[in-house]
């Protein structure tokens, strides 16, 4: 797996994790917002790393 594929895979995993948090009915809104915030920060980091390396990420 090359670096681009690795970043795309990580981006897909984060996107799925965000969706799972959104759909989780067993956590409070405060916890949900905190988890989403952390996952979005991680997603932005992955996208930034791709841009830094001049990699066009398809999942973004």
Regions found by a protein language model. Give the residues of each.
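Short amphipathic alpha-helical coiled-coil/interface segments
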Residues: 36-46
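N-terminal acidic leader/helix
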Residues: 1-33, 50-58
């Amino acid at each position: 797996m090359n670096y681009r594929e690795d970043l795309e895979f990580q981006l897909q995993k984060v996107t799925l994790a965000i969706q799972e948090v959104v759909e989780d009915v067993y956590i409070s809104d405060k916890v949900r917002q905190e988890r989403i915030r952390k996952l979005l920060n991680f997603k932005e980091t992955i996208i930034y790393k791709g841009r830094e390396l001049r990699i066009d990420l398809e999942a973004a």
